[in-house]
Curated annotation (Swiss-Prot):
Residues 88-150 form the S4 RNA-binding domain. One of the primary rRNA binding proteins, it binds directly to 16S rRNA where it nucleates assembly of the body of the 30S subunit. With S5 and S12 plays an important role in translational accuracy. This is Small ribosomal subunit protein uS4B. The gene is rpsD2. One of its GO terms (molecular function) is structural constituent of ribosome. It comes from the Bacteria. Disulfide bonds: none annotated. Part of the 30S ribosomal subunit. Contacts protein S5. The interaction surface between S4 and S5 is involved in control of translational fidelity. It comes from Clostridium perfringens (strain 13 / Type A). Keywords: Ribonucleoprotein, Ribosomal protein, RNA-binding, rRNA-binding. Belongs to the universal ribosomal protein uS4 family.
Length: 197
């Protein structure tokens, strides 16, 4: 499976965005000039924003382009539709539900088959959740202390479009998120403009 490679904290500095999920990522990235600090052309600004969003969700270029095509073909605003597609990926929702400390860790957990979606084992990080879908940590995976601690420590800090059942190690994708509820600082309209040319 293709992966986004490269020093993670260096990538944070280069893109001017915490794309690894670590709470101290930007501090550990150190000082230096990011692309976001440099004077860029309109095209350069749009390209940077696309790279920031792609890196945040850990999506490869080809798959990201497919998501963009789907967003443009939807009945919604392309930028918000794109964010909704990315946000509904299983690896991201595992992260939002508090099972993992980063999207990267969530992707590994999904790959290793630690979750059931509506009672069925799913090990595809790009699997898209629908509203009302339930994600449960498998019984045998609850023996891993890190997974249990991640979930319990995140109780009360989940996003508004997710609910959790602590005793059942369950997260539910309850509703479509509003744009302002998605916790990422990105100007999706710049990405729409990039692909509109």
């Amino acid at each position: 499976m293709a992966k986004m490679m490269g020093p993670r904290f260096k990538m944070c500095r280069r893109l001017g965005l915490n794309v690894v999920g670590h709470p101290k990522a930007m501090k550990r990235a150190g000082r230096g000039t990011s692309r976001a600090d440099k004077k860029l052309s309109d095209y350069g600004i749009q390209l940077l924003e696309k790279q920031r969003l792609r890196a945040y969700y850990g999506v490869m270029e080809r798959q990201f382009t497919r998501y963009v095509d789907q967003a443009f073909n939807s009945k919604e605003q392309p930028g918000e539709a794109l964010l909704m597609i990315l946000e509904s990926r299983l690896d991201n929702m595992v992260y939002r539900m508090g099972f993992a400390s980063s999207i990267r860790q969530a992707r590994q957990m999904v790959n290793h088959g630690h979750f059931l979606v509506n009672g069925k084992k799913v090990n595809i990080p790009s699997f898209r959740l629908n509203i009302g879908d339930e994600v449960v940590l498998r019984e045998k995976s609850r023996k891993t202390e890190m997974f249990v601690n991640n979930f319990k420590d995140s109780i009360g800090s989940e996003v508004p479009y997710v609910s959790k059942e602590e005793d059942n190690f369950k997260g539910i994708f309850t509703r479509k998120p509003k744009r302002e509820e998605i916790p990422i600082t990105i100007q999706e309209q710049l990405i729409v403009e990039f692909y509109s040319k």
